[in-house]
Every structure is written in C-alpha cells, then in structure tokens.
Amino acid sequence: EDFALGFSLSEGILRDKSELYDIEIVQQLDGIELRMDVATESFVKLKEKRRNLVGRTGCGLCGAESLAQALRLPVLDDSKQEASKNDALRANIHAASRALITASSIESAFANMQVKQVLQKATGATHACAWVNMDGMVEVVREDVGRHNAMDKLVGALAKAPQQQAGFVLTSSRASYEMVQKVAMAGLDILVAISAPTGLAVRLAEAYGVTLVGFLREHQFVIYTHANRIKV
C-alpha cells in the first residue's frame, strides 16, 4: 500500500491521498498486482501520460518517450515552485522538512539507518530510504531491491502518517535525478545520499530548490545544492 500511494504521488498521478479510494493487493506467482480505485480526474490524467507504468526494481526512463516527458517538474521561481509541490505530503511534513538541520544529525543518520535495515541484513540485496529527525534518528524506513521503489514506499508511508518531526530524507543509494524528482514531487526539501549524485540530479536539485547531499560517511559528506538548510 505504501508503494501504491507513494508511486502515484511521486509520479504525479495523484495530487492527494484522498484521490485514492481503495487498493486491492493480489498475490501473483511472479509478484504482486495492485488494483487501485482512483478519482476520475486522476484516471484521465494517467491515460494522458502515455507511459508504461509497469513497476520494476529499478526504473529511470522506463516507458517515457523522451527526457522532457520524464522530467515532470518545470523550472519555477520560488513562489510558483512552492505552490506546485504535492498537497498530500505538504500538510504532513513539508514545513518540518524546511527546518535547519545540523551536520551532526546527518552524520548520526549514517549509522542509525544501517541498524534499521532489516531486509538488508537478511539478504544483502536491498536499498533503504528513511525519514530522519533533527537528532539524526530514523523515524520511518522502507526497503526494496530498487532504490526508486524504496523512495516511493517512503513517500507513501509519510503521506499516510500523522505530522512528522522536522528532518530529511536519507537514501542508501546514489542520488539519481529520479530520486531528486520524487523528493521534489513529494514537497520535501532535503535529500541525503550515501553514494554520489549524478550531474543531472545536481542540476535538478538546484532548479527545484532541493538541498542535495552526497557521499555520506561517518564523519563527512558533500553538500551540492542549497547549503543554507544545513548548519555546519
């Protein structure tokens, strides 16, 4: 359910969780089928996207006919960008995510998320995305074989949750442009990645007002964009 809601929000299919009326989870031999009942306006929007939205473990331009189609967010000034962010998460955590975070909280998150990665410990084959509070403690974590899926699960979990504490998103993967885009679509402001960001991810983060941090280690990290949200 977290994935279904989060994917729909981060892909712009739904603007708010209230547009998702029901989810039926059907176990299949080779996976899981999600049957979703959504608002008519959202269904029409989905048909107009002309994109194959088959879920995979890792998908960037899958089904998109062009890079322009894949890059869903326009470059906006601050006032318009604020208004464009997803309503579903803005009510829960957008204001909290705008708080100033410290270097020590980012560094603490590195170890704290590893402790929370249950599937990774069992399989050694999963990524994780987490919501981390101002003290560097992991509040919510979601895992998946694919980093994009893990991010969608986190977005869905946060959309369903009550007001979250101030904090930021942490991912165990590299920061691709898709990860930055999903964070921006969800109305979040800070993405911290354990590995490197791509060049396009940095450019999009700068344009969309997302603070992007990469190469997180126990006592160091690199700030790529909008460093004003981090107190070093």
What feature does the model see in each segment?
Residues 229:
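An anion-binding catalytic pocket shared by soluble metabolic enzymes
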Residues 1-129, 134, 138-140:
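Intrinsically disordered, low-complexity regions enriched in acidic/Ser/Thr/Pro/Gln residues
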Residues 115, 119-173:
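Glycine- and Gly-Pro-enriched alpha-helical subdomains that act as flexible
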Residues 132-133, 224-226:
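Short beta-strand-to-turn element immediately C-terminal to the catalytic PLP-Schiff-base lysine
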Residues 147-224, 232:
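Feature captures the catalytic cores and cofactor-binding loops of soluble hydro-lyases/lyases
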